Amino acid sequence: MLKVAILDDYQNVSQEFVDLKKLSGKYEFKIFSEPFLDEADAIEQLADFEALLIMRERTPISKNLIDNLNDLKYIITSGVRNKSVDLEAAKRRKIIVCGTESNTNPTCELTWALILGLSRNLKTEIDNMYQGYWQTTVGFELKGKIIGLIGLGKVGSQVSKIANAFGMQVMAWSENLDLDKCKELNVLPCSKEDLIKTSDYISIHVQGGDRYKDCITIKEFDQMKKTAFLINTARGPIVNEDDLIIALSTNVIMGAGIDVYENEPLSETNKLRFLPNALLTPHIGYVTAENYSIYYTQMIEDLEACVNGKPIRVIEK
């Protein structure tokens, strides 16, 4: 039987979305619900597996990991692409990499949950409500405010439509901004500097990788309005985390809504956890029952197709 590892099932829900018992005669499954301690631990625990079913970018599938898993034949990732998989290393080993479809609206929805939570001080008000207090803060309206979007792809476009519905002014910048799309979505194209300086809300929606690494550092924070809010539901390294902590702890900006981090899971002692003006969620932008149903169902479809010699949804670059 083919040995298959299902990685990073943090919530122990994979079997709620796919019936592994029906496949028990063909595959030997093992579910990993905890993160690996480090890459050496991953290599040791995954040494005998022929297929990895991975949940987004929770475990990096590096060149070193791939080169040390001698039996590995298939890497099946949830989502259309996964930047944590070294595709060149997989290609050299003739390992097939496949993906799945994915809904982007959950990330847009969470973005607005964070924006609204920050605007109406929900973290403080909810905590205070359970302690017996009543109306302890004053929030802000969205109408008439400026929201600057770093990235106007699928998620950024969805965010812009809702911003317009709220009566906000929408600006956007990225290195490959589509001006026709800006016109279509009633979005004002601008420079990065103008976006940083004029926005009341700055929301990040570009892909990870070297292009946008440290796109937001202390330099950008110092240029923002003192009343600005930063929202990041894209990738952690886009915002320099040390600089974010400084900006929040010294009130350089009003607050931040963060779903993604430089290192995940976020350390229990990370300073972000103790900042009152940081509204944090544990990378749940894509975590919905609807998305998980797509992921797990299609990962099994991918696996079956690979084993039958007719791979589907192959990722090559």
PLM-predicted stretches and their roles:
Residues 1, 72, 143-146, 218, ...:
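Phosphate-coordination loops involved in phosphoryl transfer and adenosine-cofactor binding
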Residues 1-51, 55-56:
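N-terminal glycine-/charge-rich "phosphate-binding" loop or analogous flexible N-terminal tail
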Residues 10-12, 34-37, 56-60, 79-82, ...:
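Short beta->alpha connector loops
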Residues 47, 60-63, 176-271:
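Rossmann-like adenosine-cofactor binding region
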Residues 49-126, 140:
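Phosphate/diphosphate ligand-binding glycine-rich loop within oxidoreductases
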Residues 97, 227-317:
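Rossmann-like dinucleotide-binding domain for NAD(H)/NADP(H)
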Residues 108-127, 161-168, 297-305, 310:
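Oxidoreductase and adenylate-handling cofactor-binding alpha/beta cores
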Residues 125-158, 185:
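Glycine-rich NAD(P)-binding loop of Rossmann-like domains
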